[in-house]
């Protein structure tokens, strides 16, 4: 399991930080993404929809994905 905290990052920086981690994930691996900005959540979820990742859970300020 990987953990990424993008709290305090601007939307583009948050997305790029998450993407760097996601591309090196192994099949079946999970990533826990914590964020603060609602716009970061929106942009991260838009990126996830364009790629082959599974949303496991979405809670307040936490997104859990799997490859």
Where would I find each of the regions flagged by the language model?
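An N-terminal amphipathic alpha-helical segment
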Residues: 1-25
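Short glycine/proline-enriched coil/turn segments at helix->beta-strand junctions
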Residues: 27, 49, 58-61
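Glycine- and other small-residue-rich loops at beta-strand/loop junctions that grip anionic moieties
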Residues: 7, 33-36
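Intrinsic-disorder/low-complexity, polar/charged segments enriched in Ser/Thr/Lys/Arg/Asp/Glu/Gln
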Residues: 1, 30-32, 62
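C-terminal edge-of-domain segments
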Residues: 55-67
């Amino acid at each position: 399991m990987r953990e990424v905290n993008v709290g305090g990052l601007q939307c583009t920086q948050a997305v790029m930080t998450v993407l760097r981690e996601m591309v090196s994930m192994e099949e079946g691996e999970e990533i826990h993404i914590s964020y603060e900005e609602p716009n970061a959540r929106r942009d991260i979820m838009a990126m996830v929809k364009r790629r082959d990742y599974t949303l496991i859970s979405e809670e307040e300020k936490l997104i859990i994905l799997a490859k």
